[in-house]
Amino acid sequence: IEGVDTRALVRHLRDNGSKMGIISTEIFDVDELAERLAAAPTLVGENLVKTVSCPAPHEFVAADLPATHDFALAVAAPARHKVVAYDCGVKRGILEGLVRAGCDLTVVPWDTPARQVLDMNPDGVFLSNGPGDPDAVVETYEQVQQLIGKVPIFGICLGHQMISLACGAQMEKLKFGHRGGNQP
């Protein structure tokens, strides 16, 4: 892609919010592309988590962790905490970071029943990041509702939203995503 004034695009998105878009290397008719875009489904109400979660519970073993790296603990701490991680689309680096912090991890699918998690007798439950509309991931936050008060729970990104929904919060999509300090 070339010839796009990215600064003008960023200003437009800032003022008008995030937009659906379409790019094609085969269709060049603007009206046809506009029709295809109008017919495309939105992400609102779509549970994308079920398409990216692991299919079955498994132990996460980070045997191939580098001995050191600049952005995390220098060496993995001995496993002190048994943590069950709900996989809502978790990134491997996050699991590796938890291992480095001393967690013994069991990763479970996004819709694993709370009773099954509690039967694992974890010291804590981690809710991972993931894609899509948090309101569409009902099965996860319903399980979190059953875990609250029984085991410590922590999360990141979508995981925070799952905890909030389980506690009765309502989600509202921001006009545009927040991606750091260099906002236009």
Predicted regions: what is each one?
Residues 119, 124, 128-184:
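Cysteine-nucleophile active-site neighborhood
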